[in-house]
């Protein structure tokens, strides 16, 4: 009889969960799934050795840059080169990142974004933070890479240095402006486990309810239907949350030890 009752409860919970997922916006479902994959990938990548992480980040940045560059090259006309002074060709080639054909722009943007992402990754791993110095060094490196792929070895060294310095200055200015005008959202460490639970259940929109009721992570083993009702969480989500806590070995153990 006990097993039948437990089976009925499980089927009821699964039915409620299925209903909640059906009612969830498809775009929201995709965002949640993408966030889970992104978080898992970043967690895996952070555990790899520095050369592996740098190579993966550089490759991803290069692919992203190539896609953007190819798209821009498709939408913009290619600059004609007939009758141009050969001495000015190196400088002209460097200006074609924004006016060249799809392949030219894809190559140039791949070099810029790939090298920038790779150097920034290495700097962050070594220094343990993202700061102005890391941003400037990454931008300088991407400027050198851009000069090499756009003008080749025939380009004058001073042009490459000037271009790289320009990249570094612009990146430094944008970094400081970003620090001034943007306030990065810092996740509250007291709600980490609750946030993860709600994300798994597709109920992340109720995180504000948890914070409003001060239902921090230490209170999770003590949660009751009435406590969730007091913070205006509907019956369906309440069932899912309580069932999740009941199935979590660690939370269930704490709940039993307090009872």
From Swiss-Prot:
Protein's cellular compartments: Mitochondrion membrane; Plastid, Chloroplast inner membrane
Pfam families: SAM_1 (PF00536), Tim17 (PF02466)
Gene source species: Arabidopsis thaliana (Mouse-ear cress)
One GO biological process term: protein insertion into mitochondrial inner membrane
Gene inactivation effect: Plants lacking both HP30-1 and HP30-2 are yellow to pale-green and impaired import of CEQORH in chloroplast inner membranes.
Membership in a protein family: Belongs to the Tim17/Tim22/Tim23 family.
Stored PANTHER family: CHLOROPLASTIC IMPORT INNER MEMBRANE TRANSLOCASE SUBUNIT HP30-2, MITOCHONDRIAL IMPORT INNER MEMBRANE TRANSLOCASE SUBUNIT TIM22
Assembly and interaction partners: Probable component of a protein-conducting channel made of HP30-1, HP30-2 and HP20 that mediates the import of transit sequence-less proteins into the chloroplastic inner membrane. Interacts with CEQORH.
Origin: domain of life: Eukaryota
Bilayer topology: Multi-pass membrane protein
General function of this protein: Together with HP30-1 and HP20, triggers the import and insertion of transit sequence-less multi-pass transmembrane proteins (e.g. CEQORH) into the chloroplastic inner membrane.
Cellular component aspect of the GO annotation: chloroplast; chloroplast envelope; chloroplast inner membrane; mitochondrion; plant-type vacuole; plasma membrane; plastid; TIM22 mitochondrial import inner membrane insertion complex
Gene responsible for this protein: HP30-2
TM segment ranges: 55-75, 108-124, 135-155, 158-178
Protein name: Chloroplastic import inner membrane translocase subunit HP30-2
Chief place where the protein resides: mitochondrion
InterPro entries (alphabetical): SAM (IPR001660), SAM/pointed_sf (IPR013761), TIM22 (IPR039175)
């Amino acid at each position: 009889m006990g097993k039948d009752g437990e089976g009925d409860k499980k089927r009821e919970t699964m039915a409620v969960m299925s209903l909640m997922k059906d009612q969830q916006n498809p775009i929201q479902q995709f965002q949640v799934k993408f966030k889970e994959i992104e978080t898992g990938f970043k967690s895996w990548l952070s555990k790899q050795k520095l050369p592996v992480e740098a190579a993966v980040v550089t490759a991803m940045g290069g692919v992203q840059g190539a896609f953007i560059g190819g798209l821009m090259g498709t939408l913009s006309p290619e600059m004609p080169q007939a009758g141009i002074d050969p001495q000015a060709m190196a400088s002209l080639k460097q200006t074609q990142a924004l006016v060249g054909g799809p392949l030219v722009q894809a190559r140039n943007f791949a070099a810029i974004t790939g090298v920038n992402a790779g150097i920034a990754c290495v700097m962050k791993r070594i220094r343990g933070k993202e700061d102005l110095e890391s941003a400037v060094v990454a931008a300088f490196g991407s400027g050198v890479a851009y000069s090499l792929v756009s003008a080749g070895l025939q380009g004058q060294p001073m042009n490459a240095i000037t271009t790289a310095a320009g990249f570094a200055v612009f990146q430094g200015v944008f970094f400081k402006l970003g620090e001034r005008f943007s306030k990065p959202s810092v996740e509250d460490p007291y709600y980490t486990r609750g946030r993860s639970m709600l994300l798994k259940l597709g109920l992340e929109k109720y995180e504000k309810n948890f914070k409003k009721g001060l239902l921090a992570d230490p209170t999770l083993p003590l949660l009751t239907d009435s406590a969730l009702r007091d913070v205006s969480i509907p019956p369906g989500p309440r069932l899912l949350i309580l069932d999740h806590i009941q199935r979590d070995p660690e939370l269930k153990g704490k709940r039993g030890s307090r009872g």
